[in-house]
Protein backbone atom coordinates (compact mmCIF):
# COMPACT_ATOMS: atom_id res chain seq x y z
CA UNK A 1 0.00 0.00 0.00
CA UNK A 2 1.34 3.41 -0.98
CA UNK A 3 1.76 5.94 1.82
CA UNK A 4 -0.46 9.05 1.74
CA UNK A 5 0.73 12.51 2.56
CA UNK A 6 -0.85 14.38 5.47
CA UNK A 7 -2.55 16.70 3.01
CA UNK A 8 -3.91 13.76 1.04
CA UNK A 9 -5.35 11.97 4.07
CA UNK A 10 -6.91 15.20 5.38
CA UNK A 11 -8.42 15.86 1.94
CA UNK A 12 -9.91 12.36 1.88
CA UNK A 13 -11.25 12.78 5.42
CA UNK A 14 -12.79 16.14 4.40
CA UNK A 15 -14.47 14.62 1.35
CA UNK A 16 -15.78 11.64 3.36
CA UNK A 17 -17.05 13.57 6.39
CA UNK A 18 -18.64 16.46 4.49
CA UNK A 19 -20.38 14.06 2.10
CA UNK A 20 -21.58 11.82 4.94
CA UNK A 21 -22.72 14.50 7.43
CA UNK A 22 -24.49 17.04 5.20
CA UNK A 23 -27.23 17.54 7.81
CA UNK A 24 -26.81 16.85 11.51
CA UNK A 25 -28.76 17.81 14.61
CA UNK A 26 -26.71 17.79 17.81
CA UNK A 27 -27.73 18.69 21.36
CA UNK A 28 -25.35 19.88 24.08
CA UNK A 29 -24.18 22.69 26.35
CA UNK A 30 -22.67 25.92 24.97
CA UNK A 31 -19.11 26.60 26.18
CA UNK A 32 -16.19 28.85 25.22
CA UNK A 33 -18.61 31.23 23.45
CA UNK A 34 -16.99 34.06 21.50
CA UNK A 35 -18.99 36.58 19.44
CA UNK A 36 -16.96 38.92 17.23
CA UNK A 37 -18.51 42.41 17.26
CA UNK A 38 -17.03 43.45 13.92
CA UNK A 39 -17.76 40.37 11.81
CA UNK A 40 -20.83 39.22 13.72
CA UNK A 41 -19.64 35.58 13.62
CA UNK A 42 -19.99 33.37 16.73
CA UNK A 43 -17.62 30.57 17.72
CA UNK A 44 -18.30 28.09 20.54
CA UNK A 45 -18.04 24.46 21.61
CA UNK A 46 -20.89 22.06 22.19
CA UNK A 47 -20.25 19.54 24.98
CA UNK A 48 -21.84 16.81 27.03
CA UNK A 49 -20.44 14.84 29.94
CA UNK A 50 -18.00 12.87 27.77
CA UNK A 51 -17.10 14.84 24.63
CA UNK A 52 -16.72 18.24 22.93
CA UNK A 53 -17.14 19.45 19.33
CA UNK A 54 -16.36 22.89 17.95
CA UNK A 55 -19.11 24.94 16.24
CA UNK A 56 -19.29 28.05 14.04
CA UNK A 57 -22.26 30.33 13.50
CA UNK A 58 -21.71 32.85 10.73
CA UNK A 59 -23.25 36.31 10.76
CA UNK A 60 -26.06 35.61 8.28
CA UNK A 61 -27.42 32.74 10.38
CA UNK A 62 -26.62 34.46 13.69
CA UNK A 63 -28.92 37.38 12.78
CA UNK A 64 -31.83 34.96 12.42
CA UNK A 65 -31.67 33.64 16.00
CA UNK A 66 -34.83 34.21 18.02
CA UNK A 67 -32.93 34.22 21.32
CA UNK A 68 -29.59 35.34 22.80
CA UNK A 69 -26.94 32.63 22.76
CA UNK A 70 -25.36 32.35 26.25
CA UNK A 71 -22.59 30.41 27.96
CA UNK A 72 -23.81 27.22 29.65
CA UNK A 73 -27.07 27.17 27.70
CA UNK A 74 -28.53 23.83 26.59
CA UNK A 75 -29.24 24.04 22.86
CA UNK A 76 -29.84 21.92 19.79
CA UNK A 77 -27.89 22.91 16.67
CA UNK A 78 -28.73 22.03 13.08
CA UNK A 79 -25.94 22.17 10.51
CA UNK A 80 -23.26 20.30 8.54
CA UNK A 81 -19.81 18.92 9.36
CA UNK A 82 -16.96 20.89 7.80
CA UNK A 83 -13.23 20.02 7.85
CA UNK A 84 -10.27 22.42 7.87
CA UNK A 85 -7.48 20.36 6.15
CA UNK A 86 -4.43 22.45 7.20
CA UNK A 87 -4.99 21.47 10.85
CA UNK A 88 -7.09 18.36 10.39
CA UNK A 89 -9.84 20.01 12.47
CA UNK A 90 -13.51 19.41 11.99
CA UNK A 91 -16.51 21.32 13.33
CA UNK A 92 -20.23 21.87 12.93
CA UNK A 93 -21.15 24.78 10.66
CA UNK A 94 -24.48 25.77 12.29
CA UNK A 95 -27.47 26.86 10.21
CA UNK A 96 -30.03 27.05 13.04
CA UNK A 97 -29.89 26.91 16.83
CA UNK A 98 -32.78 26.37 19.24
CA UNK A 99 -32.88 26.28 23.04
CA UNK A 100 -33.35 22.83 24.48
CA UNK A 101 -36.98 21.66 24.24
CA UNK A 102 -37.78 24.60 21.91
CA UNK A 103 -39.73 22.26 19.67
CA UNK A 104 -42.02 21.22 22.50
CA UNK A 105 -42.56 24.88 23.40
CA UNK A 106 -43.51 25.70 19.82
CA UNK A 107 -45.97 22.79 19.76
CA UNK A 108 -47.48 23.89 23.06
CA UNK A 109 -47.87 27.44 21.72
CA UNK A 110 -49.67 26.23 18.59
CA UNK A 111 -52.02 24.14 20.72
CA UNK A 112 -52.70 27.16 22.94
CA UNK A 113 -53.42 29.33 19.89
CA UNK A 114 -55.97 26.80 18.64
CA UNK A 115 -57.60 26.68 22.07
CA UNK A 116 -57.92 30.47 22.25
CA UNK A 117 -59.11 30.66 18.65
CA UNK A 118 -62.00 28.33 19.48
CA UNK A 119 -62.86 30.56 22.46
CA UNK A 120 -63.08 33.59 20.12
CA UNK A 121 -60.02 35.42 21.49
CA UNK A 122 -58.88 36.42 17.98
CA UNK A 123 -62.29 37.26 16.46
CA UNK A 124 -62.52 40.79 15.04
CA UNK A 125 -66.09 41.22 16.26
CA UNK A 126 -64.81 40.88 19.84
CA UNK A 127 -62.25 43.67 19.41
CA UNK A 128 -62.99 47.06 20.99
CA UNK A 129 -62.70 50.18 18.79
CA UNK A 130 -59.73 52.50 19.19
CA UNK A 131 -60.66 55.75 21.00
CA UNK A 132 -60.43 58.77 18.71
CA UNK A 133 -59.13 61.31 21.25
CA UNK A 134 -57.72 59.55 24.34
CA UNK A 135 -57.49 61.71 27.45
CA UNK A 136 -56.02 59.14 29.86
CA UNK A 137 -53.89 56.11 28.94
CA UNK A 138 -52.42 53.40 31.20
CA UNK A 139 -48.93 52.26 30.16
CA UNK A 140 -48.02 48.84 31.57
CA UNK A 141 -44.20 48.77 31.50
CA UNK A 142 -41.13 49.31 33.63
CA UNK A 143 -40.95 52.93 34.76
CA UNK A 144 -37.15 52.93 34.30
CA UNK A 145 -37.25 51.53 30.76
CA UNK A 146 -36.27 53.26 27.53
CA UNK A 147 -39.68 52.27 26.17
CA UNK A 148 -41.46 54.43 28.78
CA UNK A 149 -39.17 57.40 28.05
CA UNK A 150 -39.76 57.12 24.28
CA UNK A 151 -43.52 56.84 24.70
CA UNK A 152 -43.67 59.96 26.87
CA UNK A 153 -41.63 61.93 24.35
CA UNK A 154 -43.80 60.94 21.36
CA UNK A 155 -47.07 61.42 23.28
CA UNK A 156 -46.10 64.96 24.31
CA UNK A 157 -45.22 65.84 20.72
CA UNK A 158 -48.35 64.35 19.15
CA UNK A 159 -51.12 64.94 21.71
CA UNK A 160 -49.88 66.77 24.83
CA UNK A 161 -53.36 67.00 26.36
CA UNK A 162 -53.36 63.21 26.92
CA UNK A 163 -52.32 62.00 30.40
CA UNK A 164 -50.02 58.95 30.41
CA UNK A 165 -49.99 56.90 33.62
CA UNK A 166 -47.17 54.38 34.01
CA UNK A 167 -48.12 51.28 36.00
CA UNK A 168 -44.70 49.97 37.02
CA UNK A 169 -44.55 46.31 35.99
CA UNK A 170 -41.98 43.52 35.81
CA UNK A 171 -41.60 42.90 32.05
CA UNK A 172 -39.29 39.85 31.93
CA UNK A 173 -37.99 36.97 33.98
CA UNK A 174 -39.58 35.14 36.87
CA UNK A 175 -42.75 36.80 38.09
CA UNK A 176 -43.25 38.72 34.82
CA UNK A 177 -46.51 37.01 33.84
CA UNK A 178 -48.17 37.53 37.23
CA UNK A 179 -47.03 41.17 37.37
CA UNK A 180 -48.44 41.93 33.90
CA UNK A 181 -51.77 40.21 34.68
CA UNK A 182 -52.16 42.20 37.92
CA UNK A 183 -51.33 45.49 36.18
CA UNK A 184 -53.90 44.87 33.42
CA UNK A 185 -56.56 44.05 36.02
CA UNK A 186 -55.67 47.15 38.05
CA UNK A 187 -55.89 49.50 35.06
CA UNK A 188 -59.18 47.94 33.95
CA UNK A 189 -60.66 48.31 37.46
CA UNK A 190 -61.12 52.04 36.74
CA UNK A 191 -63.47 51.23 33.86
CA UNK A 192 -66.70 53.27 33.92
CA UNK A 193 -65.43 55.50 36.74
CA UNK A 194 -64.40 59.13 36.81
CA UNK A 195 -60.73 58.13 36.53
CA UNK A 196 -61.26 55.52 33.82
CA UNK A 197 -58.53 54.94 31.25
CA UNK A 198 -59.36 55.29 27.55
CA UNK A 199 -56.73 52.68 26.67
CA UNK A 200 -54.34 50.17 28.23
CA UNK A 201 -50.98 49.69 26.48
CA UNK A 202 -48.75 46.73 27.40
CA UNK A 203 -45.29 47.76 26.20
CA UNK A 204 -41.65 46.74 26.32
CA UNK A 205 -38.66 47.06 24.00
CA UNK A 206 -36.93 44.35 22.03
CA UNK A 207 -35.03 41.42 23.47
CA UNK A 208 -34.33 37.75 23.01
CA UNK A 209 -37.18 35.35 22.43
CA UNK A 210 -36.59 33.98 25.92
CA UNK A 211 -37.17 37.45 27.36
CA UNK A 212 -40.32 38.00 25.31
CA UNK A 213 -41.77 34.50 25.64
CA UNK A 214 -43.73 35.43 28.77
CA UNK A 215 -46.17 37.32 26.53
CA UNK A 216 -47.20 34.00 24.97
CA UNK A 217 -48.65 32.97 28.34
CA UNK A 218 -52.34 32.05 28.54
CA UNK A 219 -52.85 34.12 31.72
CA UNK A 220 -51.85 37.35 29.95
CA UNK A 221 -54.10 36.41 27.03
CA UNK A 222 -57.02 35.90 29.45
CA UNK A 223 -56.39 39.26 31.15
CA UNK A 224 -56.36 41.14 27.83
CA UNK A 225 -59.46 39.36 26.53
CA UNK A 226 -61.49 39.98 29.70
CA UNK A 227 -60.54 43.67 29.96
CA UNK A 228 -63.44 46.06 29.30
CA UNK A 229 -60.98 48.83 28.40
CA UNK A 230 -59.48 49.07 24.90
CA UNK A 231 -56.06 47.37 24.92
CA UNK A 232 -52.88 47.46 22.82
CA UNK A 233 -49.90 45.11 22.73
CA UNK A 234 -46.55 46.72 21.86
CA UNK A 235 -43.91 44.10 22.62
CA UNK A 236 -40.45 43.92 21.02
CA UNK A 237 -39.85 44.84 17.39
CA UNK A 238 -41.72 44.53 14.08
CA UNK A 239 -40.47 40.95 13.57
CA UNK A 240 -41.58 39.80 17.04
CA UNK A 241 -45.13 38.49 16.97
CA UNK A 242 -46.50 37.18 20.26
CA UNK A 243 -49.76 35.79 21.54
CA UNK A 244 -50.56 39.06 23.31
CA UNK A 245 -50.47 40.81 19.91
CA UNK A 246 -53.27 38.59 18.62
CA UNK A 247 -55.48 38.83 21.72
CA UNK A 248 -55.22 42.59 22.37
CA UNK A 249 -57.66 44.87 20.54
CA UNK A 250 -54.78 46.32 18.50
CA UNK A 251 -51.10 45.51 17.90
CA UNK A 252 -48.23 47.97 17.56
CA UNK A 253 -44.81 46.93 16.27
CA UNK A 254 -42.95 48.90 18.97
CA UNK A 255 -43.82 51.01 22.05
CA UNK A 256 -43.14 54.20 20.06
CA UNK A 257 -45.38 52.96 17.25
CA UNK A 258 -48.14 52.41 19.82
CA UNK A 259 -48.18 56.13 20.61
CA UNK A 260 -48.20 57.02 16.91
CA UNK A 261 -51.18 54.72 16.31
CA UNK A 262 -53.15 55.55 19.46
CA UNK A 263 -52.74 59.32 19.67
CA UNK A 264 -53.86 61.76 16.98
CA UNK A 265 -51.42 64.35 15.65
CA UNK A 266 -52.06 67.83 17.07
CA UNK A 267 -50.34 69.38 14.02
CA UNK A 268 -52.62 67.51 11.60
CA UNK A 269 -55.71 68.53 13.58
CA UNK A 270 -54.52 72.14 13.70
CA UNK A 271 -54.32 72.08 9.90
CA UNK A 272 -57.79 70.50 9.71
CA UNK A 273 -59.22 73.15 12.06
CA UNK A 274 -57.64 75.90 9.97
CA UNK A 275 -59.28 74.36 6.92
CA UNK A 276 -62.65 74.17 8.70
CA UNK A 277 -62.28 77.82 9.72
CA UNK A 278 -61.65 78.91 6.11
CA UNK A 279 -64.66 76.92 4.90
CA UNK A 280 -66.81 78.47 7.64
CA UNK A 281 -65.71 81.98 6.65
CA UNK A 282 -66.47 81.30 2.97
CA UNK A 283 -69.89 79.85 3.85
CA UNK A 284 -70.69 82.89 6.02
CA UNK A 285 -69.69 85.30 3.23
CA UNK A 286 -71.83 83.41 0.71
CA UNK A 287 -74.81 83.38 3.12
CA UNK A 288 -74.36 87.10 3.83
CA UNK A 289 -74.29 87.86 0.09
CA UNK A 290 -77.43 85.78 -0.50
CA UNK A 291 -79.29 87.61 2.28
CA UNK A 292 -78.15 90.96 0.89
CA UNK A 293 -79.44 90.09 -2.58
CA UNK A 294 -82.72 88.93 -1.06
CA UNK A 295 -83.14 92.21 0.85
CA UNK A 296 -82.39 94.20 -2.30
CA UNK A 297 -85.01 92.17 -4.13
CA UNK A 298 -87.57 92.90 -1.40
CA UNK A 299 -86.70 96.62 -1.49
CA UNK A 300 -87.15 96.66 -5.25
CA UNK A 301 -90.52 94.93 -4.90
CA UNK A 302 -91.68 97.56 -2.41
CA UNK A 303 -90.47 100.35 -4.68
CA UNK A 304 -92.48 98.97 -7.59
CA UNK A 305 -95.62 99.36 -5.47
CA UNK A 306 -95.02 103.07 -4.78
CA UNK A 307 -96.95 105.90 -6.54
CA UNK A 308 -93.78 107.27 -8.06
CA UNK A 309 -93.01 103.93 -9.59
CA UNK A 310 -96.57 103.65 -10.97
CA UNK A 311 -96.13 107.05 -12.67
CA UNK A 312 -92.85 105.85 -14.11
CA UNK A 313 -94.50 102.68 -15.41
CA UNK A 314 -97.25 104.75 -17.12
CA UNK A 315 -94.59 106.88 -18.81
CA UNK A 316 -92.91 103.74 -20.08
CA UNK A 317 -96.22 102.43 -21.42
CA UNK A 318 -96.87 105.75 -23.25
CA UNK A 319 -93.39 105.61 -24.77
CA UNK A 320 -94.05 102.05 -25.96
CA UNK A 321 -97.34 103.19 -27.59
CA UNK A 322 -95.56 106.03 -29.42
CA UNK A 323 -92.96 103.61 -30.76
CA UNK A 324 -95.70 101.21 -31.84
CA UNK A 325 -97.54 104.03 -33.69
CA UNK A 326 -94.36 105.06 -35.50
CA UNK A 327 -93.74 101.46 -36.51
CA UNK A 328 -97.28 101.12 -37.89
CA UNK A 329 -96.88 104.36 -39.88
CA UNK A 330 -93.61 103.14 -41.39
CA UNK A 331 -95.21 99.83 -42.23
CA UNK A 332 -98.10 101.63 -44.00
CA UNK A 333 -95.67 103.73 -46.06
CA UNK A 334 -93.71 100.59 -47.04
CA UNK A 335 -96.91 98.97 -48.27
CA UNK A 336 -97.74 102.05 -50.37
CA UNK A 337 -94.26 102.07 -51.88
CA UNK A 338 -94.51 98.39 -52.75
CA UNK A 339 -97.88 98.99 -54.42
CA UNK A 340 -96.52 101.86 -56.53
CA UNK A 341 -93.54 99.75 -57.62
CA UNK A 342 -95.91 96.97 -58.65
CA UNK A 343 -98.01 99.39 -60.77
CA UNK A 344 -94.85 100.79 -62.39
CA UNK A 345 -93.73 97.27 -63.31
CA UNK A 346 -97.09 96.48 -64.87
CA UNK A 347 -96.94 99.67 -66.97
CA UNK A 348 -93.43 98.92 -68.16
CA UNK A 349 -94.51 95.52 -69.52
CA UNK A 350 -97.53 96.79 -71.54
CA UNK A 351 -97.45 96.25 -75.46
CA UNK A 352 -97.51 99.97 -76.19
CA UNK A 353 -94.53 100.71 -73.99
CA UNK A 354 -92.68 97.65 -75.30
CA UNK A 355 -93.06 98.79 -78.94
CA UNK A 356 -91.88 102.27 -78.10
CA UNK A 357 -88.91 100.84 -76.22
CA UNK A 358 -87.85 98.65 -79.17
CA UNK A 359 -88.09 101.64 -81.52
CA UNK A 360 -86.00 103.71 -79.15
CA UNK A 361 -83.33 100.99 -78.98
CA UNK A 362 -83.18 100.76 -82.84
CA UNK A 363 -82.71 104.50 -83.13
CA UNK A 364 -80.00 104.39 -80.48
CA UNK A 365 -78.15 101.66 -82.39
CA UNK A 366 -78.41 103.55 -85.69
CA UNK A 367 -77.03 106.59 -83.95
CA UNK A 368 -74.05 104.55 -82.68
CA UNK A 369 -73.39 103.19 -86.21
CA UNK A 370 -73.48 106.66 -87.67
CA UNK A 371 -71.14 107.90 -85.02
CA UNK A 372 -68.76 105.03 -85.72
CA UNK A 373 -68.75 105.84 -89.48
CA UNK A 374 -67.78 109.35 -88.69
CA UNK A 375 -64.65 108.13 -86.87
CA UNK A 376 -63.50 105.60 -89.53
CA UNK A 377 -60.05 106.26 -91.06
CA UNK A 378 -59.54 106.39 -94.81
CA UNK A 379 -59.01 102.66 -95.23
CA UNK A 380 -60.99 101.52 -92.19
CA UNK A 381 -64.20 99.48 -91.80
CA UNK A 382 -66.94 99.45 -89.18
CA UNK A 383 -67.22 96.17 -87.15
CA UNK A 384 -70.63 94.94 -85.96
CA UNK A 385 -72.11 91.73 -84.58
CA UNK A 386 -75.80 90.98 -84.95
CA UNK A 387 -76.27 94.58 -86.21
CA UNK A 388 -74.75 95.88 -82.98
CA UNK A 389 -71.53 97.90 -82.87
CA UNK A 390 -68.79 95.98 -81.01
CA UNK A 391 -65.24 96.73 -79.96
CA UNK A 392 -62.42 94.41 -81.14
CA UNK A 393 -61.40 93.45 -77.58
CA UNK A 394 -64.95 92.17 -76.96
CA UNK A 395 -64.77 89.58 -79.77
CA UNK A 396 -64.27 85.85 -79.11
CA UNK A 397 -63.03 83.02 -81.33
CA UNK A 398 -65.91 81.78 -83.55
CA UNK A 399 -67.93 85.05 -83.49
CA UNK A 400 -69.68 85.99 -86.83
CA UNK A 401 -69.13 89.67 -87.64
CA UNK A 402 -69.94 92.18 -90.44
CA UNK A 403 -67.45 94.69 -91.89
CA UNK A 404 -68.72 97.72 -93.84
CA UNK A 405 -67.83 101.19 -94.97
CA UNK A 406 -69.20 103.61 -97.62
CA UNK A 407 -68.05 101.36 -100.49
CA UNK A 408 -68.66 97.73 -99.43
CA UNK A 409 -70.03 95.25 -96.86
CA UNK A 410 -68.44 91.88 -95.88
CA UNK A 411 -68.97 88.98 -93.41
CA UNK A 412 -66.22 87.22 -91.45
CA UNK A 413 -65.54 84.72 -88.64
CA UNK A 414 -63.05 85.36 -85.82
CA UNK A 415 -60.18 82.82 -85.82
CA UNK A 416 -58.07 84.39 -83.05
CA UNK A 417 -58.07 87.35 -80.70
CA UNK A 418 -54.82 88.95 -79.54
CA UNK A 419 -55.30 91.58 -76.88
CA UNK A 420 -52.71 94.27 -76.21
From Swiss-Prot:
Q: Which GO annotations describe the biological process of this protein? A: DNA catabolic process
Name the Enzyme Commission number(s) assigned to this protein. 3.1.11.6
A cellular-component GO term for this protein: exodeoxyribonuclease VII complex
Its predominant location is: cytoplasm
Which CDD domains does the record cross-reference, listed alphabetically?
A: ExoVII_LU_OBF
Look at the named UniProt entry and state the broad enzyme category this protein falls under. Answer: hydrolase
InterPro entries, per database record: Exonuc_VII_L, Exonuc_VII_lsu_C, OB-fold_nuc-bd_dom
GO molecular function per UniProt: exodeoxyribonuclease VII activity; nucleic acid binding
Q: Where in the cell is it found?
A: Cytoplasm
Top-rank taxon of the source lineage equals: Bacteria
Q: Report keywords, A-Z.
A: Cytoplasm, Exonuclease, Hydrolase, Nuclease
Reactions it catalyzes: Exonucleolytic cleavage in either 5'- to 3'- or 3'- to 5'-direction to yield nucleoside 5'-phosphates
Q: What is the protein's known function?
A: Bidirectionally degrades single-stranded DNA into large acid-insoluble oligonucleotides, which are then degraded further into small acid-soluble oligonucleotides.
How does the record describe its quaternary structure?
A: Heterooligomer composed of large and small subunits.
PANTHER family in alphabetical order: EXODEOXYRIBONUCLEASE 7 LARGE SUBUNIT
Family indicated by similarity: Belongs to the XseA family.
Q: Kindly provide the name given to this protein in its UniProt entry.
A: Exodeoxyribonuclease 7 large subunit
Its source organism is Helicobacter acinonychis (strain Sheeba)
